[in-house]
């Protein structure tokens, strides 16, 4: 073992089965505590954001007189799960949740197909880098500033049908090591 070697337990997992083989229900059951946690966090965020908006609607003088911060910070929604998301959106959410995230996709075929949704394959490269916990830098004109995540921690889990999986592993995915990173 090398002294300075560091690995993250990032997992990409897929439950494989026939259509109607009851793949989704066990996964939903296992994720229920995470869903409940994220729901409670979202409820708290909604309250904090309503208070933030109320505070921001006040003038600076009114905030000072009320003993509030002159420039209050917007609340952050804490979460563990994400679903249908772009790499840019994921980077923003991960920056707000540095302990890590899990992409939960009931049908992983949608995740695979999204790799070319906005551009030509760079999303697959993003996921190859994330698996190895390599730094991600998101510089897009639609974002207010650059997002730098030194050591991303994003796991992926979902279900897929055997026939669809066979179609998705054709081409570069089988030669660039992407498919090898998924536990089936």
Short names for language-model regions:
Residues 1-184:
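Phosphate-handling catalytic cores of nucleic-acid transaction enzymes
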């Amino acid at each position: 073992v090398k002294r300075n070697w560091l690995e993250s337990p990032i997992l990409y997992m897929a439950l494989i089965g026939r259509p109607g083989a009851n793949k989704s229900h066990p996964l939903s059951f296992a994720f229920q505590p995470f869903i409940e946690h994220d729901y409670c966090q979202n409820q708290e965020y909604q309250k904090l954001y309503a208070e933030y908006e109320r505070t921001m609607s006040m003038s600076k003088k009114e905030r000072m007189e009320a003993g509030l911060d002159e420039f209050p910070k917007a609340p952050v929604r804490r979460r563990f799960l994400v679903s249908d998301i772009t790499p840019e959106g994921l980077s923003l959410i991960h920056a707000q949740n540095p302990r890590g995230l899990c992409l939960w996709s009931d049908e992983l075929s949608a995740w695979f197909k999204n790799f070319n949704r906005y551009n030509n394959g760079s999303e697959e490269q993003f996921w190859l880098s994330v698996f190895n916990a390599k730094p991600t830098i998101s510089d897009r004109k639609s974002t207010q500033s650059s997002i730098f995540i030194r050591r991303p921690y994003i796991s992926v889990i979902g279900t897929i049908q055997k026939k669809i999986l066979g179609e998705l592993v054709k081409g570069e995915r089988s030669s660039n090591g992407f498919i090898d990173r998924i536990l089936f």
